[in-house]
Amino acid sequence: MAKKRIAVIGAGASGLTCIKCCLEEGLEPVCFERSGDIGGLWRFQEAPEEGRASIYQSVVINTSKEMMCFSDYPIPDHYPNYMHNSQVLEYFRMYAKEFDLLKYIQFKTTVCSVKKQPDFSTSGQWQVVTECEGKQQVDVFDGVLVCTGHHTDAHLPLESFPGIEKFKGKYFHSRDYKNPVEFTGKRVIVIGIGNSGGDLAVEISHTAKQVFLSTRRGAWILNRVGKHGYPIDLLLSSRIMYYLSRICGPSLKNNYMEKQMNQRFDHEMFGLKPKHRALSQHPTVNDDLPNRIIAGLVKVKGNVKEFTETAAVFEDGSREDGIDVVIFATGYSFAFPFLEDSVKVVKNKVSLYKKVFPPNLEKPTLAIIGLIQPLGAIMPISELQGRWATQVFKGLKKLPSQSEMMAEINKAREEMAKRYVDSQRHTIQGDYIDTMEEIADLVGVRPNILPLVFTDPRLALRLLLGPCTPVQYRLQGPGKWAGARKTILTTEDRVRKPLMTRVVERDSSGGSLVTVRVLMLAVAFFAVILAYF
């Protein structure tokens, strides 16, 4: 029987891992990449490309290497915990080389349309029209994996800023920013306090005369560096923390997070504290912003009410004159124009079962991969989504009925609306552990900790108390990897390796990823469970 042919659209992080997922399931992938190279979002270019997010030269990733790596290919131990964009791209190149993925990619090939075949209701096949060097080609595929991400179109809401058309200075979207040199001696407003807005305000403040950071709601600021110098996502992404937060509820979880973030600086005193709770908005990751604010080089302002030719008037009535540049760090929107009516996007919202499958298709042969804004790393989520989707394509897994899928989609949408402030960026939110555990269940790779308590207690302890790293989903089930156990047990070694560039005497009182206090919490947790059951 001939292998099923699967079209993979995009050769960024999601596309690369989906090629590998296809190969693992015995499917034949054909990947179409509109540019001439892999990497997607993480490939820096001086000139921005339409339809693709464009990063600035200094970007450092916000998730640590142990949490963002693909599950069976750890990032080298000498790489820094938070990598520069060039190192992220290099990791993707190593991954592609290790698993021989490049030969399945057709570069400089644009996908023009993806349409159902006339017999789709029985075959589930798709007609894919592509264009390369001015020539169009039509192919038929048994399945399609869309891996174009959610940073496709710059969101520039100029209609919300009256007078911008009269402004005589320069204004542009953050996707066009590359480095701070051109802002030397200028007065700059950065609108938006997401990750890009915070980064740009900090970087530009090193050359500009003055930077103003304008925000409608304020934000909670999360450090990359957590207690004892460990990456913050390693400390927050443990199963014990996850289980306890589910028992304690959102209020206590918010209290804990806000206390942690206020320990470094008082968000109210710095003009950043929002009305909403910490977990009602995607946190802004930035280690340097409070330093620039306390030095007076960045001034936090409210929302801009209107612009004049040379000034900005804010909603609190204050005014800043002599403004030279306005940068809109207002995020991105996403669309799938090549899919026509198969997947409809309305106000940055899309109906997808588990954020992957359109519920209205007669055959589940189309999947959207990586369309999620997680509180954590996206790469391992895309990988698990790809593992699940290829199992469905192969017929190894089944989806519920359309009505059941729609009911779950609506429920998830209602829960999201209750939790998050109304914002374009919160339409595709997802918690890291929630998402990983849910999809791992569907794939059949969620670690079963209870038996390990008796057969491998050391590993069980790490799974419960340590960070919930992607490699944990290679311990058992389909795609099991022999190196998974060792990789989990040596996580802390790889965290420490790039930091130990000078030999010092190890202090036994120093911190570790699994502390005595966390161990006591685990004992208390199990005591409660035993008391109830």
UniProtKB/Swiss-Prot annotation:
Record localization: Microsome membrane; Endoplasmic reticulum membrane
Catalyses which reaction(s): N,N-dimethylaniline + NADPH + O2 + H(+) = N,N-dimethylaniline N-oxide + NADP(+) + H2O; NADPH + O2 + H(+) = H2O2 + NADP(+); heptan-2-one + NADPH + O2 + H(+) = pentyl acetate + NADP(+) + H2O; octan-3-one + NADPH + O2 + H(+) = pentyl propanoate + NADP(+) + H2O
Reported cofactor(s): FAD
Residues that bind FAD: G10, A11, G12, A13, S14, E33, L41, W42, N62, T63
Pfam families tied to this protein: FMO-like
InterPro entries in the cross-refs: FAD/NAD-bd_sf, Flavin_mOase, Flavin_mOase-like, Flavin_mOase_5, FMO-like
Tissue expression notes: Expressed in liver (at protein level). Expressed in the mucosal epithelium of the gastrointestinal tract.
Its EC number(s): 1.14.13.8, 1.6.3.1
Residues that bear Phosphothreonine: T284
The name this protein goes by in its record: Flavin-containing monooxygenase 5
Higher taxonomy: Eukaryota, Metazoa, Chordata, Craniata, Vertebrata
